[in-house]
Amino acid sequence: LAKETGLTSATVGTILNELLEKNEIVEANHGKSTGGRPPKEYSYNFDFFHCLIIFPFEKNNNTYLNICVSNLGETYLYSEERKIEKVNLQIIKNIIKEFKEKFPKIEVVGFGNAGTNQGDLITFSDYSELEGLNLSKELSIPVVIENDVNSAAIGFNKRKGGSENPSTVYIFFPESYPPGSALLIDNKLYKGFRNCAGEITNIKHILWNKNIY
C-alpha cells in the first residue's frame, strides 16, 4: 500500500488503524510468516454503509421508479419497480424516508436523471418539477446525480468488459420522450460542455416522433 500510494509505511499503518476502528475494514486472515510475526490481511467492509439508487422511467405509458439498495460491493440488497403518478421532490423524499427506516445504513443516494445536471443541481429533466432543484440540499443527504442514459451506457460497457468496443455510442429510445445518447471514448464517459454530450433531442432539423422510430 505504501508503494502504491507513495505514503510512508507509518502513515499507512495509522490510516489502517483508523479504518479498523471505524469498522470500514475488517481483519481477514493472517498471511504466511517469513520468519517474523505473520502479516495481517484486511478486507474492505462492503456493508460499512449502503446506497439507495432511484431512477424514473416510462413503461406502457406509465411512470415508474426503479428503486435499489446496494452495498459498496455492488451487491443488491433490495430492488423493485414502483408505479407512481408523477416524479417530484416530495415523492423522492418519501422514498428516502421509507428506505432509510428499512435500511438504516443508507448514507448516499444515486439518482438517474432524464436530463442534464451541474453537480447537485438539475438543470433540465423530462420530469419538469425537478428542474432547478439542488437535491443534496433539498434532501439533506449526499446525492450523486447522473444522466440516466450515461448510467446505462456505463453499465452496458462494464457488463461487456469494455475491451471489445472501448469507444461506443449508446442510444436510448424511451416510450414517451425523445431519445437520448451517451458517448464512451476509451472506456471513459464523455460529458462534453455543461454535461450536454449525448443530448441529441436538440439536434436541429430532426423532428423526433414515434413515426420515425
What are these regions (language model features)?
Residues P38, K105-E107, E199:
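A generic structural signal for well-ordered coil/turn residues at beta-strand boundaries
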Residues L1-F46:
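N-terminal helix-turn-helix DNA-binding module of bacterial transcription factors
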Residues V144-Y213:
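Glycine/GP-enriched mid-protein hinge/lid loop-to-helix segment characteristic of carbohydrate kinases
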Residues H30, E81, R194-N195:
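Short clusters of small/polar residues that mark proteolytic maturation junctions
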Residues L77-S167, I212:
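Glycine-rich phosphate-binding loop and adjoining helix at the ATP-binding site
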Residues G36-L77, V169-L189:
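Gly/Thr-rich phosphate-binding beta-strand-loop-beta motif of the actin/hexokinase/Hsp70
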Residues N60-N62, E85-N88, G162, E199-T201:
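A short local loop/turn or secondary-structure capping micro-motif enriched for an aromatic residue
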